């Protein structure tokens, strides 16, 4: 049902969803096969998975179909679309983005089924590096490459959210209805259980190219070190962009990537004329109830394939002065960012090794309690972009990145994920990720520079991070 409420003498529509639920056995299906069954019938569908099954939270995969409301920001306009197709357009230069997102989120409510402990509804989407002008007092000067241009931000509410509980081999279909809409749960169940699904091939259609040569990247590292020497910044994270043309179905690249580089955040978001997908090791920010959490990642070494050797490398990593100094700065930055709207900020774990397919990272955990009456999206603005993708002090690092990188970041180092109507927030940083647009795959990687960084080692770090993506491109051709 759909009710009109008066709030502060201004008319605001409050949309309350009537949610229908159906539970199915999921022991013969996978999120990938279900997504393949649904994506041609429901364009603009999303898939979120996790291969980090250490906790019950990460045992759930989600598929979202049929957007029914959304908020979208580009260079000039903010567009709000409500159920029933009512659209409101505002001048992007005259808005307070944090408040707009909060107001839009507050336009919806649903009755969550607490005992299921699943995401049944909310806003799913992303925001790009371009949003930084709405979070920080900074003006980006690098022009956006039209080939990489996508909306700065978009979140949607979906009619169908499918949750797959891998731990219990159960699947839930949540259908969100307004007014007197008829349920189509039967049809959705039929589509999910249909034995057939279409598959297509993927082919590379040319060589990889980059916005910078190896030597230019080494020179950029030297230039950043000069700024550190002068005291402009303590640490900075320049990056390098790559692109490769292709033909066919890029979903095969996602399938290859999730197999080669399992990670806590696997995602495939299809927006029709472009797609965002990746296998990110790093959370941008998590908010659950009153607690906000950042997981700074810094310290990267290539894996050997031998667990005993890898553990020795992890110990060495913790003792490496360059890696530890970088990590200390990022933990301090996370504490400072959270302190703006949180109390009781503390470091809960420090420099613990985490193992991924090609590399080992050192990870810490910093938490804070939201102050009373705080808009959770304020915390998002405070903590974006992650220090691990910018540097410290953050404002100066961002200014230098804008001046020297030569390529507007667009999706790279943006954030992607889920935001609850209640303000809960769980987003990954868009690293180890692809933007697919007009038959070209764009991808990017960087590394943290401190005073004693070695340009050759920094070049190698970028290659280590890109390795899994390049390997996925090769494997995708064989699927």
Q: What are the residue ranges of the model-derived segments?
A:
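Extended alpha-helical targeting/anchoring segments
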Residues: 2-479
């Amino acid at each position: 049902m759909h009710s009109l409420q008066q709030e502060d003498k201004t008319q605001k529509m409050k949309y309350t969803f009537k949610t229908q639920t159906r539970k199915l056995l999921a022991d013969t299906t996978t999120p990938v096969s279900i997504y393949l069954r649904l994506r041609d019938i429901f364009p603009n569908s999303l898939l979120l998975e996790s291969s980090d099954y250490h906790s019950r939270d990460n045992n759930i995969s989600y598929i979202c179909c049929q957007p029914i409301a959304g908020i979208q920001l580009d260079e000039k306009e903010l567009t709000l679309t409500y159920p029933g197709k009512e659209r409101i357009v505002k001048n992007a230069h005259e808005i307070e983005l944090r408040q707009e997102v909060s107001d839009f989120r507050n336009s919806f409510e649903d009755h969550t089924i607490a005992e299921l402990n699943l995401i049944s509804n909310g806003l799913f989407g992303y925001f790009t590096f371009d949003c930084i002008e709405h979070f920080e007092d900074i003006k980006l000067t690098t022009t956006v490459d039209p080939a990489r241009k996508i909306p700065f931000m978009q979140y949607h509410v979906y009619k169908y959210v499918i949750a797959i509980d891998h731990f219990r081999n159960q699947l839930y279909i949540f259908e969100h209805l307004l007014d007197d809409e008829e349920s189509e749960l039967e049809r959705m169940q039929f589509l999910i259980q249909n034995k057939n699904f279409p598959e297509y091939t993927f082919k590379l259609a040319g060589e990889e190219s980059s916005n910078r040569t190896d030597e230019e990247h080494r020179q950029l590292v030297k230039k950043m070190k000069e700024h550190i020497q002068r005291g402009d910044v303590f640490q900075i994270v320049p990056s390098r962009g790559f692109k490769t043309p292709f033909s066919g179905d890029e979903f095969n690249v996602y399938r290859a990537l999730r197999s080669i580089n399992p990670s806590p955040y696997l995602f495939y978001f299809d927006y029709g004329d472009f797609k965002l997908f990746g296998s990110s090791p790093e959370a941008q920010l998590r908010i659950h109830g009153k607690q906000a959490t950042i997981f700074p990642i810094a310290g990267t070494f290539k894996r050997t394939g031998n667990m005993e050797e890898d553990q020795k490398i992890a110990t060495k990593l913790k003792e490496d002065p360059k890696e530890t100094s970088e990590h200390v700065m990022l933990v301090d930055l996370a504490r400072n960012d959270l302190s703006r709207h949180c109390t009781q900020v503390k470091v809960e774990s420090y420099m613990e090794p985490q193992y991924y397919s090609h590399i080992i990272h050192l990870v810490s955990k910093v938490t804070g309690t939201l102050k009373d009456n705080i808009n959770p999206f304020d915390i998002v603005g405070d903590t974006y972009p992650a220090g691990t993708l910018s540097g410290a002090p953050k404002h100066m690092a961002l200014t230098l990145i804008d001046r020297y990188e030569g390529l507007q970041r667009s999706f790279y180092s943006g954030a992607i994920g889920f935001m609850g109507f209640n303000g809960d927030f769980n987003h990954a940083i868009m690293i180890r990720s692809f933007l697919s647009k007009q038959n070209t795959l764009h991808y990017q990687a960087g590394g943290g520079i401190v005073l004693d960084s070695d340009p050759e080692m920094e070049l190698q770090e970028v290659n280590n991070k890109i390795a899994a993506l390049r390997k996925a491109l090769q494997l995708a051709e064989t699927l």
